[in-house]
UniProtKB/Swiss-Prot annotation:
Name used for this protein in its record: Palmitoyltransferase ZDHHC2
Function, as annotated: Palmitoyltransferase that catalyzes the addition of palmitate onto various protein substrates and is involved in a variety of cellular processes. Has no stringent fatty acid selectivity and in addition to palmitate can also transfer onto target proteins myristate from tetradecanoyl-CoA and stearate from octadecanoyl-CoA.
Residue positions of motif Non-canonical dileucine endocytic signal: 334-335
Quaternary organization: Monomer. Homodimer. The monomeric form has a higher catalytic activity.
GO molecular function: palmitoyltransferase activity; protein homodimerization activity; protein-cysteine S-myristoyltransferase activity; protein-cysteine S-palmitoyltransferase activity; protein-cysteine S-stearoyltransferase activity
Length: 366
């Protein structure tokens, strides 16, 4: 019992420590509000019109910054649905049999009705030993959260949360509004910073706040601009941070552009179809996080597919609908021999991509 108790104490201590970066950002944000709204706008600005304009614009950016930051922190990451979890009997088989063909057969049977297109580097079905589930496309296991996260991008210590399918849009808006917030502060604070620096204004308590505020805003603007630009590039290519470091592996091999549908569709996959919600931290992303449209460079004859533009869906035995996955239009000549998703009851003997490949081995990606 002692090790268990000490382990629980360590876990609680780690949970507390994980909040330190969030507390730091919150304190810095609170100080910046005091320094800008009080010391700069109310104390140092003499022009009433300038005060009003700066305070209105500042509070708008401040509100959007806090809102998007809050949503990024407290939106729970989405986990794979029950269709991807192994049944009790399948778990028993995996535990009873030695690793080998028996394990592969269990995974093949479990995955035959699931819309999974990606594989491990060795071509195996992506299976998580920790969560005991077959990983959906773009899903990864987070060692910090100790869960499989749908469309995991990365675990961010500054929000103490996993950034994935459920909150990636919020994270992007958080970066955007924090960058605008810092740029606005630096731009409107610059003239007062110069005047204090050259002793053009009296040496008051506001001097420290105004000068340090400019340094902090300028410093964060540089770091945020590079990070925001990088994630804009990721969105334009329909990649996650993990996929940028390691290209996704499909049945035919690696494909760095496997999920890219073109700039417009890539944007809409994150921000949604209704543009009125794009700048608001409300969930509007497309899909369910378990299945994603993909453009495959080469058609896999064993992999069922549906031409782009068709509204067909696939159903598993639990009546969970998954959208069909189109190929690139340049590969339309391959569609003549392609198969379509069918209900498991209609074709019980056929599996999904790679299910009949005896070379598949089970790996645990963490």
């Amino acid at each position: 019992m002692a090790p268990s108790g000490s382990g629980g104490v360590r876990r609680r201590c780690r949970r507390v420590l994980y909040w330190i970066p969030v507390v730091f950002i919150s304190l810095l944000l609170g100080w910046s509000y005091y320094a800008y709204a009080i010391q700069l706008c109310i104390v140092s600005m003499e022009n009433i019109g300038e005060q009003v304009v700066c305070l209105m614009a500042y509070h708008l950016l401040f509100a959007m910054f806090v809102w998007s930051y809050w949503k990024t922190i407290f939106t729970l990451p989405m986990n794979p649905s029950k269709e991807f979890h192994l049944s009790y009997a399948e778990k028993e088989l995996l535990e009873r049999e030695p690793r080998g063909e028996a394990h592969q057969e269990v995974l093949r049977r479990a995955a035959k009705d699931l819309p999974i297109y990606t594989r491990t580097m060795s071509g195996a079905i992506r299976y998580c030993d920790r969560c005991q589930l077959i990983k959906p496309d773009r899903c990864h296991h987070c060692s910090v959260c100790d869960k499989c996260i749908l469309k995991m991008d990365h675990h961010c210590p500054w929000v103490n949360n996993c950034v994935g399918f459920s909150n990636y849009k919020f994270f992007l808006l958080f970066l955007a509004y924090s960058l605008l917030y810092c740029l606005f502060i630096a731009a409107t604070d610059l003239q007062y910073f110069i005047r204090f620096w050259t002793n053009g204004l009296p040496d008051t308590q506001a001097k420290f706040h105004i000068m340090f505020l400019f340094f902090a805003a300028a410093m964060f603007s540089v770091s945020l601009s590079s990070l925001f630009g990088y994630h804009c590039w990721l969105v334009s290519k329909n990649k996650s941070t993990l996929e940028a470091f390691r290209n996704p592996v499909f049945r035919h091999g690696t494909d760095k552009n496997g999920f890219s549908l073109g700039f417009s569709k890539n944007m809409r996959q994150v921000f949604g179809d209704e543009k009125k919600y794009w700048l608001l931290p409300v969930f509007s992303s497309q899909g369910d996080g378990c299945s994603f449209p993909t453009c495959l460079v080469n058609q896999d004859p064993e992999q069922p597919s549906t031409p782009a533009g068709l509204n067909s869906t696939v159903k598993n035995p639990e009546n969970h609908q998954f959208p069909a996955k189109p190929l690139r239009e340049s590969q339309s000549h391959l569609l003549k021999d392609s198969q379509t998703w069918t209900e498991s009851s209609a074709n019980p003997g056929k599996g999904k991509a790679g299910m009949s490949n005896p070379a598949l081995t089970m790996e645990n990606e963490t």
